[in-house]
């Protein structure tokens, strides 16, 4: 059974770009277009990883991430932030909120794929699906 990834961004062309590139690698990709929808999809679909934008309507990506980290059933889901917010303060806020990887837009889709693969490999290598330390170094 393929790993399931939730791609969340209010820009549909970004979601499509993420979806196409991850599906080419054999992942199942589900989508959401705002923060509230993202939390609903996490509860309903139980993804193995979330690719999350920051600037979205209704609830921003930092709020989504904080909600995921507070919930015992979702706190260990790896989250990759994919955002145009590249200021040091934004990146730091992401790390403080519990993000596992922070990529800025514009992004190279193959770099995203590489980070996804490295996170899943780290989980498999650890033998503990709940591990929160992922080696995504290159």
What positions do the PLM features span?
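Receiver (REC) domain active-site loop signature in two-component systems and cognate sites
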Residues: 56
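C-terminal output helix
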Residues: 107-117
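Acidic, metal-coordinating helix/loop segments flanking the phosphotransfer/catalytic sites
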Residues: 31-49
């Amino acid at each position: 059974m393929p790993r399931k990834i939730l791609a969340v961004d209010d820009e549909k062309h970004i979601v499509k770009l993420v979806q196409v590139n991850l599906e080419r690698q054999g992942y199942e990709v589900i989508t959401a277009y705002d923060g509230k929808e993202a939390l609903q999809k996490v509860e309903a679909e139980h993804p193995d990883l979330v690719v999350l934008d920051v600037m979205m309507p209704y609830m921003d990506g930092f709020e989504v991430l904080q909600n995921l980290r507070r919930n015992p059933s979702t706190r260990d889901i790896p989250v990759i932030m994919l955002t145009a917010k590249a200021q040091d303060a934004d990146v730091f806020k992401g790390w403080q909120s519990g993000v596992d990887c922070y990529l800025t837009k514009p992004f190279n889709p193959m770099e995203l794929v590489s980070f996804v693969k490295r996170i899943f490999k780290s989980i498999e290598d650890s033998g503990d699906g709940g591990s929160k330390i992922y080696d995504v170094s290159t």
